[in-house]
């Protein structure tokens, strides 16, 4: 058996396994171990929840991992652990054709959001991630925008139709093969919420890595595919829900993130941005 670490996995250790079979051939899988004590303490059911999510999405027409086994409490492995199928492809942050890449990045979302909402208990309801501090980042040129956004973040959520959402949808969780999406990974945060949340999470990552123009192109494609309008409230929920991590990210396009937040605040009619 061989194992190699996979990139990502902020809340867990993730390895690709290759196991030689007795009759010849190799079985490939992904092992995710929730090894961070603070993660398990906060979410003791995280492995069982992810297993439940993978079972739920298995019949859906999306390239999701297939659950092989789960050790929910770590009784056998020492830590909450999942074994799942290894999907083909690689993450691609450097597309040769941005327009095609954005369209194909958006195409799985209508399928996901059309999935029938399951009975209570299968998926949790969306909520904004709490932060250690809600102060504007030190690099902000418009701290008043962040303060207004924080007020919206803590306010009552708007009434809106809810769907199944990935909750962590962005290019780092999308695999590509021969120029097409071959896998959607990292499902433990899947929830019931506004479809705009998935769009906003992807937008935030596009903002940080590229710029606002790329994020807006992605949003326009999603709106064209679905006939829906993006709710800027979701930008606020996602960006403020990432605030702790945005403070010191050296790769962040700070101007684009702040401009997107300012536009969201202005579009919701909360003062002048």
Question: Where are the language model's segments positioned?
Answer:
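Active-site Asp-x-Gly
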Residues: 162-165, 175-219
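A general structural signal marking secondary-structure boundaries and capping sites
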Residues: 61, 71, 90, 112-117, ...
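Helix-rich C-terminal or lid/interface subdomains of diverse kinases
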Residues: 103, 192, 201-273
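An alpha-helical support segment within catalytic cores of ATP-dependent transferases
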Residues: 110-167, 263-273
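Generic detector of well-ordered alpha-helical packing
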Residues: 51, 86, 167-169, 187, ...
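ATP-binding pocket architecture of kinase catalytic cores
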Residues: 4-123
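Conserved catalytic motifs of the protein kinase core domain
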Residues: 26, 79, 160-162, 180
């Amino acid at each position: 058996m061989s194992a190699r670490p996979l990139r990502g996995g902020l809340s867990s250790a993730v390895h690709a396994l290759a196991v030689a079979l007795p009759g010849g051939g190799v079985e490939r899988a992904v092992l995710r171990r929730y090894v961070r004590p603070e993660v398990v303490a906060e979410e003791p059911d995280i492995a069982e929840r992810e297993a439940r999510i993978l079972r739920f999405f298995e019949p859906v027409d999306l390239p999701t991992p297939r659950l092989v086994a789960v050790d929910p409490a770590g009784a056998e492995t020492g830590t909450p652990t999942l074994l799942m199928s290894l999907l083909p492809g690689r993450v691609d942050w450097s597309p040769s054709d941005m327009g095609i890449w954005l369209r194909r990045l958006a195409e799985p979302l209508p399928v996901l959001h059309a999935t029938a909402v399951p009975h209570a208990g299968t998926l949790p309801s969306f909520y904004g991630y709490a932060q250690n501090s809600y102060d504007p980042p030190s690099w902000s040129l418009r701290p008043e925008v962040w303060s207004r956004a924080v007020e919206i973040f803590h306010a009552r959520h708007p009434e809106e139709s809810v769907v199944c959402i990935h909750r962590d949808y962005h290019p780092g969780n999308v695999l590509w093969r021969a120029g097409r999406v071959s896998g959607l990974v990292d499902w433990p945060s899947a929830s019931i919420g506004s479809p705009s949340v998935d769009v906003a999470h992807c937008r935030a990552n596009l903002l940080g890595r590229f710029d606002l123009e790329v994020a807006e192109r992605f949003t326009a494609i999603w709106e064209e595919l679905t006939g829906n309008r993006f709710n800027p409230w979701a930008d606020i929920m996602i960006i403020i829900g990432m605030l702790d991590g945005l403070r010191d990210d050296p790769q962040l396009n700070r101007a684009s993130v702040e401009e997107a937040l300012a536009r969201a605040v202005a579009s919701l009619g909360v003062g002048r941005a």
